[in-house]
Amino acid sequence: MTTPPAYGIRANPDLLPRIPLDARAILDVGCGAGGLGAAWRRRNPHTRLIAVEPDAALAAEAEPHYDEIHRLDIEAGSPPVAEGSLDALVFGDVLEHLRDPWAVLRGTARLLAPDGVLVACVPNVEHWSFAARLLMGGWRYEETGLFDRTHLRWFTRDGMHQALVEAGLVPVDVAPRIVDAPGIEDFVRRISPALQALGVEPAGYARRAAPLQYVWRATRRRPARLAVVARTLRPVGGINEVRIHEPLAALASRPGVVARVEPGAGIPQMPPGIPGIIVLQRQLLNAPSAPDYLRALRATGALIIQEFDDDPAHWPVIEESGHLAFRGVHAVQTSTPALRELFLRWNPEVAVFPNALATVPEPRNFTSPDRLTLFFGALNREGDIAPFLPALNAVLAEAGERLAVQVLHDRATFDALETPHKRFAPLGSYAEYQAAMAGCEIAFLPLRDTRFNRMKSDLKFVEAAAHRLCCIASPVVYGATIRDGETGRIVQAPDEFAHALRALLATPAEALRMAEAARAEVIASRLLARQAAARLSWYRSLIERRAELDAALLARVPVLGAATTHTPR
């Protein structure tokens, strides 16, 4: 007989992203074994995490993940938390276990800061499985789940909305958790005649009965609203995740912000009545139809931002089209100060958001002191690594099975490695890329000294360091980030590379020391939690200055003020 996992050992994946990523103080009521605290530490280790848990054994298990944990019954008394001090108050599967959840909501709402948010996950008493079991005569309590024998209270969507309002809060949004879509479809199909006989519209009933739970967000005052829609490139090498998906998810963790990512270059349907921003990911805007496209985007009323994180000289058509890619938008966002200086030639409104990670993973390397694996997984780096291959092969010959190599995407480099201790994987998803990297101890990051490379960011170092890899890198780009001998090694020539690699093989503890230092640096300064507020502040400032920015746009490109002939797609 297997022992069931401790209550609360896993974080609710639908609740976690609805907590503001840059929250400074969070109270987790009924934290159980601390799953939410553990997961949150990987997203924002700088948050002050406070928990309430009445069960002594669970509290002891959760304690390492929180700054404070109070062993008390939330219905018997409030935790020692100052009124107005919390950015987030979390009830994850807790309210249904309380005798008087309405009183608890009223009592704890005062702990929220003026812009703080209550996040709660509650079961839906209208879930179709309730009706199904009652109709079939099989309703009984269970140890866990919707029919948990410790559930004392039940909520409908309308009932929970009323409870939040009566607690003095403003319901902001609610997300349904649907775990068995085929089940509700089959159930509604079977009982549709009865529903219709009762005057209940089957589709409406299905919407109410499908969610197993609801995740609610409510605030003390109505938040300012903002809609951000991004039009993206075809996913390649994780750039979409790092530059678009994860930053927008960070924005959407704030109440009142709606974020959506759509592939391609069509005209997005912006939510009505909400100030909007359209982000174009690296669109060249060189086609003859580009002015019409930009006019159609402008006609939505949204502010237009170009997201560009590479040297535009790599695409000559940008210059040939008069740099419309940057002149024809309200603002530009990029990843490095060098790129900002370049884009300022064509647009005075440029912001830098360094590449950062949404979460820092738990390390799973350095498990064998007798073997190290070198990771090489960047795109279009064949010319950068080629001069180093003879030196790498020499070290591989000396090291034997003590050194393996993991190569992603670059088949030519893989084939040139003279060792049986090598693995190859084609270009896959960003998750697959990270999984391959996570099993290695050393990352090799070569970059030739070219204009295009000098404009690149240090993302590969950030990703590798987060997984606790020791980086050996070129001075181009990485010399400004890596402290040689402290957070990695900087090498310029093949013989320097071979010397550094031999030293790490001789003393793996040194590789681990530098990898740990690099990981600590990423945790301190290169997580999205550190820049979420700055990005949102810039976006809101653009909205406030839209008239001014729009006038500047039309002064740069007067043709964008003409009537559009573009057909929205």
Locate each region found by the language model.
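Donor nucleotide-sugar binding/catalytic pocket of nucleotide-sugar-dependent glycosyltransferases
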Residues: 70-71, 175, 330-362
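N-terminal pre-catalytic "stem/leader" segment of glycosyltransferase-like enzymes
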Residues: 221-285
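Conserved acidic donor-binding segment of nucleotide-sugar-dependent glycosyltransferases
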Residues: 484-495, 503-508
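A charged, aromatic-enriched C-terminal amphipathic alpha-helix characteristic of glycosyltransferases
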Residues: 360, 509-547
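Nucleotide-sugar-dependent
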Residues: 314-315, 383, 430-436, 441-466, ...
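Conserved catalytic-core segment of nucleotide-activated headgroup transferases in glycan assembly
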Residues: 232-254, 359-360, 368-439
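S-adenosyl-L-methionine-dependent methyltransferase catalytic module, highlighting the catalytic core
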Residues: 4-5, 9-10, 35, 77, ...
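Conserved N-terminal segment of class I S-adenosyl-L-methionine
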Residues: 1-84, 88, 102-105, 175-195, ...
